[in-house]
Amino acid sequence: MSRVAKNPVKLPAGVEVKFAGQQLSVKGAKGTLELNIHSSVEIVEEAGELRFAARNGDQQTRAMAGTTRALVNNMVQGVSQGFERKLQLVGVGYKAQAKGTVLNLALGFSHPVDYELPEGITAETPSQTDILIKGIDKQLVGQVAAEIRDFRPPEPYKGKGVRYADEVVRRKEAKKK
């Protein structure tokens, strides 16, 4: 059995789990998330926690049980607390402004970049150079942050660009004659 799958997922107060065939639904204070469970993974709810097991003992099913456990744990954490990712804009004239479901970015191009936020994701701009992306789906929050970063990734010589708040940009020395 996968070592990850051996640990149960504790359900905090206010989080409700429902099974409908191979469909798992997790409902909490911040919203609802759904996941299709692989047929080789068995989930049992007991005493306020979820336990995961592989139906047969081969390597792929054990790995799938661990993966499912990690995904369900992220769903439980998302509907109870939510996820957030912080981005920083570094560079002269680089600005961000959130207007509803659109994020307006000035990243040194000849045109402004308008990024349409997907459903379930919100963006805040505490300052013109900081972007805070929030949502209940961990994968979607990370995907949106990566797409925004891809507009202008940090370059190694001056460090200008869009970076994650916890990212360390490797710097290069300029060529000398």
Swiss-Prot record:
HAMAP family: Ribosomal_uL6_B. Keywords: Ribonucleoprotein, Ribosomal protein, RNA-binding, rRNA-binding. The keyword Heme does not apply. The keyword Ribonucleoprotein applies. Part of the 50S ribosomal subunit. GO terms for cellular component: cytosolic large ribosomal subunit. Belongs to the universal ribosomal protein uL6 family. The gene is rplF. This protein binds to the 23S rRNA, and is important in its secondary structure. It is located near the subunit interface in the base of the L7/L12 stalk, and near the tRNA binding site of the peptidyltransferase center. It comes from the Bacteria. One of its GO terms (biological process) is cytoplasmic translation. It holds the Pfam family Ribosomal_L6. One of its GO terms (molecular function) is rRNA binding. Gene3D superfamilies: Ribosomal protein L6, alpha-beta domain. This is Large ribosomal subunit protein uL6.
